[in-house]
Swiss-Prot record:
Protein name per its UniProtKB record: tRNA dimethylallyltransferase
Catalytic activity: adenosine(37) in tRNA + dimethylallyl diphosphate = N(6)-dimethylallyladenosine(37) in tRNA + diphosphate
Co-factor requirement: Mg(2+)
Assembly: Monomer.
Residues flagged as site, Interaction with substrate tRNA: 102
Ligand binding (substrate): 13-18
Described function: Catalyzes the transfer of a dimethylallyl group onto the adenine at position 37 in tRNAs that read codons beginning with uridine, leading to the formation of N6-(dimethylallyl)adenosine (i(6)A).
InterPro entries for the chain: Dimethylallyltransferase (IPR039657), IPT (IPR018022), P-loop_NTPase (IPR027417)
Keywords, ordered alphabetically: ATP-binding, Magnesium, Nucleotide-binding, Transferase, tRNA processing
Pfam families: IPPT
Species, as recorded: Lactococcus lactis subsp. lactis (strain IL1403) (Streptococcus lactis)
EC number: 2.5.1.75
NCBIfam families: miaA
Positions of the UniProt region annotated as Interaction with substrate tRNA: 36-39
Length: 294
């Protein structure tokens, strides 16, 4: 039987995805593919909470430091490169583990976005948003009306089928070629927000301000500069706000981003979450992964 099992660890910023990903990779002979839109950039280490060299030495990591910060990295780029990496890792007899919080990237990978490149991307995302508002019954009815012979429908396959009717060739497979296990991490909101605030303070101690200043001075208009943890300091550098106000902006925007991440994973991807502070964590996840891989 073809080996096509892929683990996917998602959740809000600062919840502990990196640590779990490394634990899973060690326990199940895996390699990690970053699903973070900012960690692809060389030199942006602190503000992106990039995995450290010590962490990368424990298990192989991919899609880290693969772009200069003057280059763009799109959802299309991610899906193409992640699919190739998944194949290479599976061919080695190892387990690919996607770890990240960029919902659009991960959803597009799982649902098999390879619909003719970026030119169709906006239209496809609009259709996907419309389909995501339908109930399962409404979705399945649309699919069966087009092809009554389709069996074993689930929500993901139904959305993929309807996308292909609009944008892709009709003989493509429904969804990705891989079998994904989604692992969602979460924590009590107050605890999570406290962790976010503490992490920003730690980033400041590690030199985030200098990293942001370098980006501001060299390439303030690039895609990488739009990430949380950098753009908030630009008004400080131009003399419009105080440093304290800039730091508070980073914390506020990070908390808001965490909320948006949770909304995306819950509503658009139907992720079930594990509380990282539950008594037996992460043993239930290990049990679920063992069952999935076997």
């Amino acid at each position: 039987m073809k080996n096509n099992k892929v683990l996917v660890v998602v959740g809000p910023t600062a919840v502990g995805k990196t640590a779990l990903g490394i634990d899973l990779a060690i326990k199940f002979n895996g390699e990690i593919i970053s699903g973070d839109s900012q960690q692809v950039y060389q030199g942006l280490d602190i503000g992106t909470a990039k995995v450290t060299m010590a962490e990368q030495a424990q298990v192989p990591h991919h899609l880290i430091d693969v772009r200069k910060w003057t280059e763009n990295f799109s959802v299309h780029d991610f899906v193409i490169e992640a699919n190739q990496l998944i194949k290479e890792i599976l061919d080695q007899g190892k387990v690919p583990i996607i770890v990240g919080g960029t919902g659009l990237y991960i959803q597009s990978l799982i649902e098999g976005y390879h619909l003719g490149g970026q030119e169709n991307h906006e239209e496809m995302m609009k259709l996907r948003e419309e389909l995501s508002l339908l109930s399962d019954e409404e979705l399945f009815a649309k699919v069966i009306k087009i092809n009554p012979d389709i069996s074993e429908l689930n929500r993901r396959r139904a959305i993929r089928f309807l996308e292909l009717q609009t944008f892709g060739s009709q003989d493509e497979n429904l969804g990705s070629d891989y079998d994904f296990l989604l692992i969602g991490l979460n924590a009590d909101r107050k605890v999570l927000y406290d962790r976010i605030n503490q992490r920003v303070d730690q980033m400041m101690r590690e030199g985030l301000l200098d990293e942001a200043r370098t980006l501001y001075e060299q390439a303030p208009e690039v895609q990488a500069a739009k990430g949380i943890g950098y753009k908030e300091f630009f008004p400080y550098f131009s003399g419009d706000i105080s440093l304290e106000e800039a730091v508070e902006l980073v914390k506020r925007n990070s908390r808001r981003y965490a909320k948006r991440q949770l909304t995306w994973f819950k509503n658009r991807m139907s992720v079930e979450f594990e509380d990282v502070f539950s008594k037996n964590y992460p043993e239930p996840i290990f049990d679920k992964v063992t069952q999935f891989l076997n």
